[in-house]
């Protein structure tokens, strides 16, 4: 288990997601000043990574080694949070010897940046450079992100924005977890007995939606 001590709860989600990407096989727990005292007492002796935040930067301690970040020497046009994520990525990359294919991007939609830059009229080369330099994304994944973003734009041109709707179907079981993903999911091996009941419930809800949205156009299905 990896226990991370964070001096402020503001960035708990981002820190947890990125640390988990580097230590995919380990349970990752983040403790902050808002963590319950009894849990702090239990986990603090197990801290393996400590992050101290300040207005002008941050300090990360891994074991006995300190890593310092002076935010004033970095162009933080995209905000403190992204600067912190770059610093944390560089630190963990150095400590583990790993480079993640999606860099410091976490979440469920790593193509969002490419999509936004295409809307701004940026060239493929500009987007590629930004994703490599600002988010440490590999060239292969950055090019994939640009390609997918272009396909998304073409598809969204056909959306019925006023008379249509989108359908989201949650599947909480995954055989594996993607490195960039922070979605809540459960290993299918441990919950296999619940799959049939869950699918039955999904079908029931789909029947309800089909009956009650007959006057609208189903544009997209997210699974």
Predicted segments with their positions:
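A short, structured N-terminal alpha-helical element that caps or precedes a catalytic domain
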Residues: 1-101
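Short helix-loop-beta connector
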Residues: 161-163, 214-218
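Canonical Radical SAM [4Fe-4S] cluster-binding loop centered on the CxxxCxxC motif
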Residues: 164-197
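Core AdoMet radical
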Residues: 185-204, 209, 216-223
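N-terminal [4Fe-4S]-dependent radical SAM core
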Residues: 96-99, 119-167
């Amino acid at each position: 288990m990896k226990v991370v001590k964070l001096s402020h709860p503001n960035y708990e989600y981002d820190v947890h997601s990125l640390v988990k990407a580097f230590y995919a096989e380990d349970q990752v727990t983040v403790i902050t000043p808002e963590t319950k005292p009894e849990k702090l007492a239990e986990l603090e002796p197990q801290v393996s990574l400590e992050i101290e935040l300040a207005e002008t930067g941050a300090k990360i301690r891994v074991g006995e080694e300190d890593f310092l970040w002076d935010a004033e020497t970095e162009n933080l046009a995209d905000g403190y949070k992204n600067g912190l994520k770059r610093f944390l990525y560089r630190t963990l990359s150095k400590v583990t010897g790993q480079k993640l294919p999606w860099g410091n991007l976490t979440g469920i939609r790593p193509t969002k940046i490419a999509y936004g830059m295409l809307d701004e009229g940026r060239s493929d080369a500009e987007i590629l450079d930004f994703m490599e330099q600002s988010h440490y994304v590999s060239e292969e994944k950055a090019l994939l992100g640009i390609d997918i973003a272009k396909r998304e734009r073409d598809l969204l041109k056909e959306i019925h924005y006023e008379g249509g709707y989108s359908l989201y179907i949650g599947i909480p079981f995954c055989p594996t977890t993607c490195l960039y993903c922070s979605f809540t999911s459960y290993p299918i091996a441990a919950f296999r007995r619940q799959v049939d009941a869950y699918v039955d419930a999904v079908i029931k809800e789909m029947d309800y939606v089909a009956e009650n949205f007959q006057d609208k156009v189903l544009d997209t299905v997210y699974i």
